[in-house]
Amino acid sequence: MLTFLIPTAKEMTTPKESHPHLLPQDSQAILKIMTAMTTEDLAKSYRIKEEAAKKEQQRWQDMASQQSLAYPAYQLFNGLMYRHIKRDKLTTQEQAYITQQVYITSSFYGIIPANHPIAEHRHDFHTRIKIEGQSLKSYWRPCYNQFAKEHPQVISLLSSEFDDVFSKDCKQLWISPKFMAEKEGQFKTHSTISKKARGAFLTACMENNCQTVDSLKSLVFAGFYYHPDLSTDYEFVYIKKEA
């Protein structure tokens, strides 16, 4: 069985389905630090304006006072990649796929199933805080490595900020898809192409119920197709021709 890892997103939208918010034990130490921060501290840590930091401060306070609602993570996050993932009107098989084989890597919650209920928040590995004298990446590394040991065959759709959260020896069997546009024989990639393609790729995996590495090579989605000459055993390259 394939396991997919996807990142969080800054952009969110409030789904209709909500749950009580239950915070994992490992997240409690982070919440304690975040709730103690002033608006000015948050603005500096997030590198945002104080007006936006006030909103984030209220979210942390609501979590601490157990006033927050929680929503399925893959429906709450609404960044460009998420908007290209099929999330509505899923078949029974597709629903099982996204809830059992897709996990989200979070700097606040750890690694969680895609449908795990989470509260609205802003937090990533660029957030400048120390937990028990450790960076966020060091704090989460044992948890992340344990997940990797339990799921050796991972399809990683993660961005570069996660490269050194996992120890290198835990990623030996990982496959990282790469998405490129071809125009007049020239190949290019950039953030927008990659984010859209990650979502479309995951949707194609769900719809085709991909369970083996070889099945990924036959996927065609959003104009992309597998390019064997540019691919390696650990980096699958998908090309889309541009007019």
Curated annotation (Swiss-Prot):
Pfam family name, one: H2O2_YaaD
GO terms (BP aspect): response to hydroperoxide
Lineage top rank: taxon: Bacteria
GO CC annotations on file: cytosol
Family: Belongs to the UPF0246 family.
Name this protein carries in UniProt: UPF0246 protein M6_Spy1787
Entry's transmembrane regions: none
NCBIfam families referenced in this protein's UniProt entry, alphabetically: PRK02101.1-4 (NF002543)
